[in-house]
Amino acid sequence: MIITRNSTTPDALRETMSTTQSMFRVAAIQMASGPYVQANLQEAGRLIELAAATGARIIALPEYFAIMGMKDTDKVAAREKDGDGPIQNFLSGEARRHRVWIVGGSVPLESSQPGKVRNSCLVYNQEGKRVARYDKIHLFGFDMGQERYSEERTIEPGNSVCTVDSPYGKLGISICYDLRFPELYRAMGDVDLILVPSAFTETTGKAHWDTLIRARAIENLAYVIAPAQGGYHVNGRETHGHTMIVDPWGVVLDRLPRGSGVVVAGVNPTYQAKIRASLPALTHKTVRQW
């Protein structure tokens, strides 16, 4: 497996961050996206503006924020070339307009297979420059009762772990079903914030969402920002919601059970450093396969 580490922060700034970084706000957006890209982008823009108004420096959108189609192949029809398209232009423009870092949930990008897409989380800095791309590695498959999902039919999996340096610490990027594979997060190394844009079903979400999010925060001693789809969708799907931000001790700082909205919380690097010093579990790893 390839590990991609995106470094956009100058060495001098990283040294300054290690000694002087103070608290900052982050925001996670919850949506109930529909089949029309332009309408979804309009709603995402409204919510980004609300999040930016709180002073959030990192704003994260949920998986499939731009399209939750009537059928799985709708996202293939809406796919974009890497680096060009209305969804990518929207993300870059919003980051630049509000002077914030934006984690763009997931965007359907062209893949090597014509009938499939890459489900890609794109990260933009405050200048609107894309600084990271993560292609979802683990593809959701579920068959229980009347519910059947098989992402592999329309998505080509990625094969690279993704981290990116930011003025706010090192970010580890993942998407939804990745949550069930803790080895992915170990492969990231020591990250300060974990991003998990998601669209958990109501069935799996009510059973496992809270546990998985808090577990990833606790075992990595990291903040977890988990924007989600939450509610009933035009295509008949019901998503769990419960967008949340969790601290390195596993405490849920804020959450939104259902519907469109914004979750905001403060990130305290000093608090995180103290927790890691008190419980240095990351230095106690003895299995070195990662």
Stretch-by-stretch model annotation:
Residues 2, 37, 45-127, 202-222:
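Cys-nucleophile CN-hydrolase/nitrilase-fold catalytic domain and related Cys-dependent amidase chemistry
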Residues 10-58, 195:
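N-terminal active-site segment of His-dependent metallophosphoesterases
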Residues 30-32, 62, 135, 228:
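Residue-level recognition of beta-strand->loop/alpha-helix junctions
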Residues 67, 73-74, 122, 133-140, ...:
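Short beta->alpha transition motifs characteristic of CBS
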Residues 80-83, 112-189, 202-211, 276-281:
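Active-site catalytic loop in hydrolytic enzyme cores
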Residues 82-103, 170, 176-263:
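CN hydrolase (nitrilase-like) catalytic-core segments centered on the catalytic cysteine
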Residues 104-106, 120-123, 162-164, 243-245, ...:
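Short beta-strand scaffold segments in enzyme catalytic cores
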Residues 272-290:
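A conserved C-terminal secondary-structure "cap"
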